[in-house]
């Protein structure tokens, strides 16, 4: 598997990552055992970048990835880079969603993701969607605080045009 350099402190990461969203919802029924086997096979093939979000499966996706990390111990964690996202808030049983980028939500979402993933630090923490009503400086400031506190190694934005 080809590798890419991930920033000055991020080491190497596989050029191909595995998006885990479908392991929890959106593309039909999911099977936890099959999902765990898929994650294991991806690692065997040299994939080291795994992408999830707090909204996928209402937290189930992060819990699944956290279980996989825990079952593999420190050696597995050392070889994986975890990317997760915040900002899309959904209620169970409803299709509607809202976007929350408030600094309070950014911090709370990060803590919840760390807990579900069983991590002390998220490698890549993304703002999933932007709410233009929240000043960009506030969003970036909250994310920078998480990096400074060691809760995220890197932060950025996903699918934002404003």
Give the ranges of each region predicted by the language model:
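N-terminal binding-site loop/beta-alpha segment at the start of enzyme catalytic domains
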Residues: 1-80, 148
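N-terminal small/glycine-rich loop or linker at the start of catalytic domains
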Residues: 8-26, 83-97, 121, 126
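Active-site beta-loop-alpha junctions enriched in small/polar residues
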Residues: 21-23, 53-55, 85-89, 127-130, ...
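Generic beta-strand or strand-like secondary-structure segments
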Residues: 64-68, 81, 85, 105-112, ...
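Proline-centered loop/turn at the N-terminus of a beta-strand
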Residues: 79-81, 153-154
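Glycine/proline-rich, positively charged
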Residues: 93-162
